[in-house]
Regions:
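Alpha-helical transmembrane segments in multi-pass integral membrane proteins
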Residues: 2, 10-29, 51-55, 86-93, ...
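Hydrophobic alpha-helical transmembrane segments of multipass membrane transporters and ion channels
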Residues: 36, 40-44, 48, 251-255
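Hydrophobic alpha-helical segments with transmembrane-like composition
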Residues: 38, 86-133, 157-161, 171, ...
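Small-polar-interrupted transmembrane alpha-helices in polytopic inner-membrane proteins
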Residues: 7, 125-144, 188-197, 288
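Hydrophobic transmembrane-helix microenvironments that flank and shape a buried ionizable site
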Residues: 4, 10, 31-37, 82, ...
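Membrane-interfacial loop-to-helix junctions in multi-pass inner-membrane proteins
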Residues: 20-43, 60-73, 106-113, 121-129, ...
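Transmembrane helix irregularities
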Residues: 6, 39, 51, 105, ...
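Membrane-interface helix-loop-helix regions
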Residues: 46-104, 137-152, 162, 215-220, ...
Length: 316
């Protein structure tokens, strides 16, 4: 939920910063930027999982958790056309390493609609009203699927759209009002403690109807508390680390299960002594960050820049 809110905030913030108003958005350029950021890593993930699966490594092969076989080509098709979440709802988590793409499916469908909505509404008030409607519809939709074993209350598009919409509205608010609250620090700690309490209160399955909405709204407030002018430089070590991780969050998210899958092959969980699991966890985190950084530096960022340079001729 937090990542959906942050994603919605960033895409709206950058749109307003670049185009000044939603009606001025360049549809072609928007889609090119999205493709340049998303597709290189997505294709690399699919190729990597396909190669590893060809060696009969279970975490990278399709399974049948609900007793229904799903072909690997169909899984790839779902990944490339952004309905992996629907595949998981219908057939379960059919591929361990590719399952993470459910959230990417949600985001990309939303962002396919986002620029169209910008052009069709023309009015900021109508634009905001649509997002408010999405936010209100979210808990109702989750209530319709409350407790379902399919996980539709979590994986479906309309189960998560409200989080992205909260992020979009947060960006609109901050762009217009640029709040400079003197009580940001105590408020941020209060929000963090409240979110922690909500997280520990009950499993998400039991509080999905309202819990996801509250978490999204709290995340939006937290973004406002931590927002700084774009020219502000990170000074503390913690801030620098968080910025570094944030810049590579997409690569980390997409490939963390590849690393974990390989470790599960080498160290079968049921047969691994608990005394070394902490060391494995540390090794897993370090290896994931190293691989993500390498992919970002030598693959995704260069390709992102190249695609934009070729297909976007102006400086926007």
């Amino acid at each position: 939920t937090m990542f959906f809110v942050i994603s919605g905030f960033l895409i709206t913030h950058h749109t307003l910063k670049r185009d000044k108003q939603f009606s001025a958005i360049n549809l072609k350029h928007f889609y090119i930027r999205r493709a340049a950021r998303i597709l290189p890593c997505l294709v690399l993930l699919i190729l990597g999982v396909s190669i590893l699966g060809s060696f009969d490594l279970k975490p990278f092969m399709n399974q049948a958790p609900n007793g229904i076989e799903v072909s690997y080509p169909l899984t790839i098709f779902a990944a490339l056309t952004f309905w992996m979440n629907i595949l998981i709802i219908k057939f379960g988590w059919v591929n361990y390493a590719l399952g993470v793409l459910w959230s990417l499916s949600v985001e990309e469908v939303f962002y396919f609609v986002f620029p169209l909505l910008c052009l069709l509404t023309r009015s900021n008030k109508v634009f905001i009203a649509v997002f408010v409607g999405v936010i209100l519809y979210g808990p109702y939709f989750r209530s319709l699927h409350f407790g379902e074993e399919s996980g539709a209350y979590l994986y479906h598009y309309f189960s998560s759209f409200d989080g992205i919409a909260v992020g979009c509205l947060t960006a609109i608010f901050s762009h217009k009002y640029q709040p400079n609250w003197t009580y940001k620090k105590p408020l941020s700690w209060l929000i963090i403690l409240s979110m922690t309490a909500l997280y520990l209160y009950a499993p998400i399955k039991e509080v999905s109807t309202w819990g996801i909405s509250l978490f999204a709204l709290a995340t939006g407030l937290l973004i406002l508390c931590f927002q700084h002018p774009s020219e502000t430089q990170a000074h503390s070590l913690f801030t620098k680390v968080m910025v570094w991780l944030g810049q590579r969050s997409y690569e980390t998210y997409l490939f963390h299960l590849v690393v974990l899958g390989l470790m599960k092959v080498a160290f079968i969980p049921a047969q691994t002594d608990s005394s070394i699991k902490i060391m494995l966890l540390i090794g897993y985190l370090v290896l994931t960050f190293i691989i993500s950084a390498a992919i970002e530096k030598y693959y995704s960022t260069p390709l992102n820049s190249y695609i934009r340079k070729v297909f976007i001729k102006d400086k926007s």
